[in-house]
Amino acid sequence: MTESDTKITLIGSRLAREGLEFIFKGEMPECKKCRLKNTCLNLEPGRRYRVERIRNKDIHECFLHDSGVVAVDVSKAPILTTLESRKAVDGAKIMYEPPKCGKRECEIYEICHPEGLSRGDKCKIVEVLENLDSKCEANYSLKKVKLSW
């Protein structure tokens, strides 16, 4: 991981631990009056990130986090999802398209439509994991994959 792959942001001190993954929700009303908001809000809302390193233990006051916030390096976290089996090739670069399926009761619906990934995102297949054909209620030929975005 290079420094250009990471961003500096602030996170609640109770949450700050290496390896923590989170979905950045964006600006809250309390953020409007904060002098540090530009550092906190430099991530893309709705995306999944991972804390790579805690920069230091200095705690900054925050209107949202009662225990304050600390500076951390974060990177874009890989996302588990499904792809058509014929497109699931290690190292391939793809434009993400979720399966055309409305079967919300399906046991793999959440992984087929993961939070933090959007239709049209340019991604790389980091790893092809398992065949999910038998679990798909729409009878699609699917594989579980790990994507970087």
Curated annotation (Swiss-Prot):
Superkingdom of the source species: Archaea
Q: Which family does it belong to?
A: Belongs to the UPF0179 family.
Q: What is this protein called?
A: UPF0179 protein Mbar_A0292
- Biological source species: Methanosarcina barkeri (strain Fusaro / DSM 804)
